[in-house]
């Protein structure tokens, strides 16, 4: 089984948290709301990977003013690729508390939507298991 280290930013701006709705046809949690993030590449430092993933998935304009390592978790997930292939992967999630100076987001093809969500509204979103676990640990659910 392949192993991947995943960096995930929990991005907050003015009391709201950024959630992204995964594309329906790919990923580990198709069609569900999640944190952004992705894999650390070989030879890449963790914070470099986090900043790269944010640029790739959320655009160049989102300005982070704080990045603080917060927690980690792990599990085994089945990833669905755009061509329909499936793969079981051991995932290690490194989660960061982040503060954004703005809300200028431009999502890539991995997502179909995004939202800045106040903590009291998080219960109204179809959150994936990993995101739900993270938000519970943070005391937001």
UniProtKB/Swiss-Prot annotation:
This is Nucleoside triphosphatase NudI. A motif (Nudix box) lies at residues 38-59. Catalyzes the hydrolysis of nucleoside triphosphates, with a preference for pyrimidine deoxynucleoside triphosphates (dUTP, dTTP and dCTP). Keywords: Hydrolase, Magnesium. The keyword S-adenosyl-L-methionine does not apply. GO terms for molecular function: dCTP diphosphatase activity; dTTP diphosphatase activity; dUTP diphosphatase activity; magnesium ion binding. The gene is nudI. It comes from Escherichia coli O139:H28 (strain E24377A / ETEC). Residues 1-141 form the Nudix hydrolase domain.
């Amino acid at each position: 089984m392949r192993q991947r280290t995943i960096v995930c930013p929990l991005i907050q701006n003015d009391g709201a948290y950024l959630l992204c709705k995964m594309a329906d046809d790919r990923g580990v949690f198709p069609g569900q709301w999640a944190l952004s993030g992705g894999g650390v590449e070989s030879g890449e430092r963790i914070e470099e990977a986090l900043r790269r993933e944010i640029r790739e998935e959320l655009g160049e304009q989102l300005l982070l003013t704080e990045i603080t390592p917060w927690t980690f978790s792990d599990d085994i997930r089945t990833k669905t690729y755009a061509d329909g292939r499936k793969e079981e992967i051991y995932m290690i999630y490194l989660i960061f508390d982040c503060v954004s100076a703005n809300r200028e987001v431009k999502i890539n093809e991995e997502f179909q939507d995004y939202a800045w969500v106040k903590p009291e509204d998080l219960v109204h979103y179809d959150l994936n298991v990993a995101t739900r676990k993270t938000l519970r640990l943070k005391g937001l659910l």
